[in-house]
Amino acid sequence: MSLLDVIGPVMVGPSSSHTAGACRLALLARHALGVAPTRARFSLHGSFAKTARGHGTDLALVAGTLGAFPDDPRIARAFDVAREHGLDHDATTADLGDVHPNTVRIALEADDLRVSLTGSSLGGGLVKVFELDGFRIDFSGAHPTLLIRHLDTPGVIARVARVIADDDVNIATLVSARRKRGGEAMMSIEIDRPLSRPASAYLQHLRYVTWLRELPEVMQGSDAAAAVALSGRTEATP
């Protein structure tokens, strides 16, 4: 158990589950999209749906979508900043099935780019992402994370793992899912540190890889992680 588990995260209140966790989930969705979104739709499940306004979940989700970390004081005026940056957003209630009560599905758009991420806020600012664009994956935002869409072909996972190992980077977790045999597949890979630029470029051009995003670790505050909080800038790889 860490000190964070005892005292909770540094954040704009009132609730680590409903504010810090929600903000981090939206921030991860933004990085998965790869650019500043122009449209955001939040489908709120369970406790999130019941307390979205009272606990600031709606503000936290919009702030994370704009690039903010949970300790950013501008979360309180996230709706105003969203208007300034041309972000259209709405939130609805939804039954997402047998999942954690603090769960949200985040659908982001920008031009012809779209991403849908579903995750849960587990308490203490901790989060778990378990679905991306219909693929069952698993990552926490506590490590740099690679999201790789590829064709379900023998050897792809091994080749990706070899590139990571050759870059002297250790894999913390690797989860793979596919729609059907021989069809589209997705990997979520948590790693101990970000890949070098050459390794990242090599992965993007690897045979059978069709899409790649590199997500930063989001469990630290905005200063430590050099966030692009509420800036509207593009920060992810193409």
Regions found by a protein language model. Name each.
Residues D5-V6, R24-A32, A60, G64, ...:
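Alpha-helical scaffold segments in soluble metabolic enzymes
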Residues R41-E84:
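A structural-propensity feature for long, helix-poor, extended segments
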Residues T51-L59, P101, A185-R193:
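Short glycine/threonine-rich loop-to-helix capping motif typified by GTGT followed
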Residues L66-V115:
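Contiguous domain-boundary segments centered on the initiation and propagation of an alpha-helix
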Residues R77, H89-A94, E109-S231, E235-P238:
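A conserved regulatory-domain signal marking ACT and ACT-like small-molecule sensing domains
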